[in-house]
């Protein structure tokens, strides 16, 4: 569960790092969140296309939960990418670790049994609240830098 999450989150991290991290437009903490969420949504579309060839129920569950999961976990990672870009934090590693843990728990809850799948809902709600808090912090950092 963790290996798949690690690979997927590193793909999204690598995409942002490779394509937008060094752009002059990436100059605020919030930019890290925005660019990483955008990368995650593109990833989620491609992943769901792969699942579209399987059972309809899997596609429906993934369509409702996987897209928010990717956006939320990557948004949290993006906050730390933004911090590292603006020199407020040495490394984006804490964000990568958090994203992998959230994603790993998501995978675990969904794949272990139908009974544990319900735990995806509180995981997404709690993670969403964390992301909202980080967005507010990012806006404060960005407001202080202008």
Please provide the spans of the model-predicted regions.
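Membrane-interface helix caps and helix-loop-helix hairpins in membrane proteins
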Residues: 52-61, 108-114
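Membrane-water interface at transmembrane helix exits
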Residues: 7, 11, 16, 20, ...
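Membrane-interface helix/loop boundary segments of multi-pass membrane proteins
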Residues: 10-39, 53-57, 85-90
